[in-house]
């Protein structure tokens, strides 16, 4: 069994210290070692030791007996109970630091956040759009204003916990206190005597809400837009949570987004690729004139600047990347076959091979600067 330290040593005062000195020393140490403030493993044990020393030295009768008989003296003093039902942690903070140190700090609780998936087109994601959405949420009951009590009545103090919102129990053999949330009032400290007929005592009712959401230009798929105060109402009149609108961008028939660039695959036949061609290329803004030089290879990349997606947090736009795809015919007419055979004979003396092709995806990466 551990030997108890001298109470004067515990508080760090002389044996002839005045009551004022003892009180100041205790207050300083209580602030330092209270378990709600100090998270050190031994803080609770030190705090109990400090509390026990102060309980003896602050009482003239107990102090006198302690000075005469040591630790055996105070335990024999009338009315002294080291396992008192009072909670030393809360009583000390109530006495010296104001208010109470309760395990469940009651007050308005914020409502839950909500999520809403908003589907928009590729063009709407590029240029931005305003959409009206409709969703269900919990709102503060207009009849009882969130109290849960029938209008004209008020919640009453919980008879089980006396309004504390928690139940405290002291172990019979140890100076330890267990704190549990009151199961009658669920930690609120009050109960509804006459429930509101509108919300059945819940303080909230589920309602349909309709709002307009502004989607900024350049928003990407799976982006979230936070709308403050549009979530569920908090219980008992607590503040509303937030609404998070998750953007779902629908795929485009032929545009593909890569960051702030838009990729378009441009099919050309063999003759167009060999001889070159001028084409009208679709962009997100309309059509653009593009000249394809003779001898272009499949996978060649052309850039149309400023025709991509707007930057979300700065000015300017990305580019449109046009990727050439040479289409080889599969069903030739007799005339076309003869022409290709003649072309093949004329190309027999041309060298095969040459510079190594970097491939389709390599060209895309180079065009995007990756």
From Swiss-Prot:
CDD domains: DnaJ (cd06257), DnaJ_C (cd10747), DnaJ_zf (cd10719). A zinc finger (CR-type) spans 128-208. The keyword Membrane does not apply. Zn(2+) 1 binds at residues 141, 144, 196, 199. CXXCXGXG motif repeats lie at residues 141-148, 158-165, 182-189, 196-203. It comes from the Bacteria. Its cofactor is Zn(2+). Pfam families: DnaJ (PF00226), DnaJ_C (PF01556), DnaJ_CXXCXGXG (PF00684). InterPro entries: DnaJ, DnaJ_C, DnaJ_domain, DnaJ_domain_CS, HSP40/DnaJ_pept-bd, HSP_DnaJ_Cys-rich_dom, HSP_DnaJ_Cys-rich_dom_sf, J_dom_sf. Binds 2 Zn(2+) ions per monomer. GO terms for molecular function: ATP binding; heat shock protein binding; unfolded protein binding; zinc ion binding. Keywords: Chaperone, Cytoplasm, DNA replication, Metal-binding, Repeat, Stress response, Zinc, Zinc-finger. GO terms for biological process: chaperone cofactor-dependent protein refolding; DNA replication; protein refolding; response to heat. The keyword Glycoprotein does not apply. Its main location: cytoplasm. It is found in: Cytoplasm. Residues 6-70 form the J domain. Zn(2+) 2 binds at residues 158, 161, 182, 185. GO terms for cellular component: cytoplasm. The J domain is necessary and sufficient to stimulate DnaK ATPase activity. Zinc center 1 plays an important role in the autonomous, DnaK-independent chaperone activity of DnaJ. Zinc center 2 is essential for interaction with DnaK and for DnaJ activity. Participates actively in the response to hyperosmotic and heat shock by preventing the aggregation of stress-denatured proteins and by disaggregating proteins, also in an autonomous, DnaK-independent fashion. Unfolded proteins bind initially to DnaJ; upon interaction with the DnaJ-bound protein, DnaK hydrolyzes its bound ATP, resulting in the formation of a stable complex. GrpE releases ADP from DnaK; ATP binding to DnaK triggers the release of the substrate protein, thus completing the reaction cycle. Homodimer. Belongs to the DnaJ family. This is Chaperone protein DnaJ. It comes from Roseiflexus sp. (strain RS-1). The lineage of its organism: Bacteria, Bacillati, Chloroflexota, Chloroflexia, Chloroflexales.
């Amino acid at each position: 069994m551990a030997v108890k330290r001298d109470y004067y040593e515990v508080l760090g005062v002389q044996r002839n210290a005045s009551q004022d000195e003892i009180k100041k020393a205790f207050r300083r140490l209580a602030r330092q070692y209270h378990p709600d403030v100090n998270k050190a493993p031994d803080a609770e044990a030190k705090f109990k030791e400090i509390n026990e020393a102060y309980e003896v030295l602050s009482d003239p009768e107990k102090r006198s007996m302690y000075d005469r008989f040591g630790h055996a003296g105070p335990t024999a003093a009338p009315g002294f109970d080291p396992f008192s039902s009072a909670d030393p942690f809360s009583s000390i903070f109530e006495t010296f630091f104001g208010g109470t140190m309760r395990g469940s700090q009651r007050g308005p609780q914020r409502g839950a956040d909500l999520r809403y998936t908003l589907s928009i087109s590729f063009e709407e994601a590029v240029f931005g759009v305003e959409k009206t959405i409709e969703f269900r949420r919990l709102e503060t009951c207009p009849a009882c204003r969130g109290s849960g009590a029938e209008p004209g009545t008020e919640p009453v103090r919980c008879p089980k916990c006396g309004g504390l919102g928690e139940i405290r129990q002291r172990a019979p053999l140890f100076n330890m206190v267990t704190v549990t949330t009151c199961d009658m009032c669920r930690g609120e400290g009050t109960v509804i005597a006459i429930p509101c007929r509108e919300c059945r005592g819940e303080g909230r009712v589920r309602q349909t809400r309709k709002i307009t959401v502004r989607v900024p230009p350049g928003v990407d798929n799976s982006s979230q837009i936070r709308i403050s105060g549009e979530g569920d109402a908090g219980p008992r009149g607590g503040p509303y949570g937030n609404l998070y609108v998750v953007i779902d961008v629908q795929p485009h028939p032929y545009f593909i987004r890569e960051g702030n660039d838009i990729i378009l695959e441009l099919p050309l036949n063999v003759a167009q690729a060999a001889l070159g061609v001028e084409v009208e290329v679709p962009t997100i803004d309309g059509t653009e004139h593009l000249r394809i030089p003779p001898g272009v290879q499949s996978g060649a990349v052309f850039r149309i600047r400023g025709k991509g997606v707007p930057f979300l947090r700065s000015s300017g736009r990305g580019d449109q990347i046009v990727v050439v795809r040479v289409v080889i015919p599969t069903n030739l007419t007799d005339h076309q076959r003869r022409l290709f055979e003649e072309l093949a004979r004329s190309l027999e003396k041309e060298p095969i091979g040459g510079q190594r092709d970097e491939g389709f995806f390599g060209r895309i990466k180079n065009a995007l600067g990756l």
